[in-house]
Every structure is written in structure tokens, then in C-alpha cells.
Amino acid sequence: MNAECVIVDANIAFKCLVTGRGDLRERIGLGGHPQLFTPRFLFVELFKHKERLIRASGLPEEDLLAGLHTLLNQLTFVHEADISTEVWIWAFRLCKETDPKDTPYVALTLHLNGLFWTEDNELKTALLARGFNHFFEPWNK
């Protein structure tokens, strides 16, 4: 497992945007500087929930866009087609009963042998029950 390779879940990205900064590094803290990855599917989720993000943040659109710019510059996006079918099947089996939409994030974690950064406790519990324990915990907790 590569502790310097962290896969960022959509809920983490959303929380960073709602705070108005979009700064993932600030959420991590001073304990290290892992490389941050996410599947391209995050773009779809951000677009799908953009109105909700605007309402939840209470920020002017200009500030939210500045936070989005910061967030996107801190992430390395990985095309889902780069992940093997076998890994996709494995990830789907891990996620299917909790939330199949998390499959791209878990698949990328398995593909990169990294750590998954999520604050979805229901998902974490389900993944742990299935033997997946590759989670990232920020140093700034």
C-alpha cells in the first residue's frame, strides 16, 4: 500500500468546496504531502450537484469557482479506462450493496494501491466488513 498515493472521494471534494477554499492540503495538515488522485467521474458529480454546492456554501459564484480552481489544481485525474476490468469487478463487488457510485473511487484505490480518503462512514463500515482497509486519515483531525 502506498501511503503517498491518496484517492479523494467526492464527499471530501464537496466539503472543501462548501468551506469556500477548495484546499485539500489544508484539510490534510502538516504531516505530509501525498499525491492526490481522483477518477474523472468527479467532474460528473461536481456538475450534477453544482446547485446544491452553491446553496450549501452560501458563497458568491466567483468565490465558489475560485475554490473549484484550487481544488482541481491539487488533484491528478485518472481516466477510468486505465483501470483493468478485473479491478472494476473487484471494486463493484465491494461497493454494490452500499453505493455503487463509489465504485470508481474504490477501483482507483485498488488500481494505484493507494489509500482512500472518504468521510462516508456507512461506506467505510461496509468496506471494512468486506476486508478493504486502505483508508487515509488526515493528519489535521
Where are these predicted regions, by residue range?
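Short, well-structured N-terminal submotif of metal-dependent ribonuclease cores
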Residues: M1-T38
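Acidic, PIN/NYN-like endoribonuclease modules and their adjacent C-terminal/linker elements
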Residues: N2, T38-P39, L110-K141
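Alpha-helix capping/helix-boundary segments
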Residues: I12-A13, L42, Y105, E122-L123
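Short gly/ser/thr-rich secondary-structure transition/capping motifs
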Residues: T19, L59-E61, D99
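Residue-level signal for well-ordered alpha-helical positions
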Residues: T19-G20, H49, A129-R130
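PIN-domain endoribonuclease scaffold, especially VapC-family toxins
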Residues: L30-H33, R40-F92
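Active-site neighborhoods of divalent-metal-dependent phosphate/nucleic-acid chemistry enzymes
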Residues: T76-N121
